Each structure stands twice: as C-alpha cells, then as structure tokens.
Amino acid sequence: MAVVTRRFATGGMHCRSCSMLIEMEVGELSGVQSVTSDHAQGLTVVSYDEAATSPDQIVGAITKAGYAAELVQD
C-alpha cells in the first residue's frame, strides 16, 4: 500500500458546510485515509492509497458534491 498526499484546487466553496460536503463525498472513496477541505483557500488535501483510488476519482467525487476541482501539480 503506497499512501500519497495530493492537493486539489477546489472552486465554488463558500463556507465550512461546503468543505464538509466535499470531505464526506471524497471520504467515501476506497483507499482514502484522510481528506481536509479549506473553503477560504479553495484547496482540498487528500491522503489515499494510490492502488485503490486515483486523482480522477477524487476530482469526480468533488464534482459530484457540486464543486469544481483540479489536481495541483507539485
């Protein structure tokens, strides 16, 4: 199991409730260890097992919650 941490630029969040919705949706993905979303910074940080989940799946979960998302390349 290789756990990685990736950052996702997340647009459209206005308050802590928005962040919580994203955290719940992404947290349901297989392999996700932790997720923290910050509406003030427009950023979601996810630690996950890259054998179980992909950045595209995380972007999809954020989009499903109603927000725009893009992987931030380090």
For each feature predicted by the language model, list its residue ranges.
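Flexible metal-binding regulatory segments at protein termini and peripheral loops
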Residues: 1-74
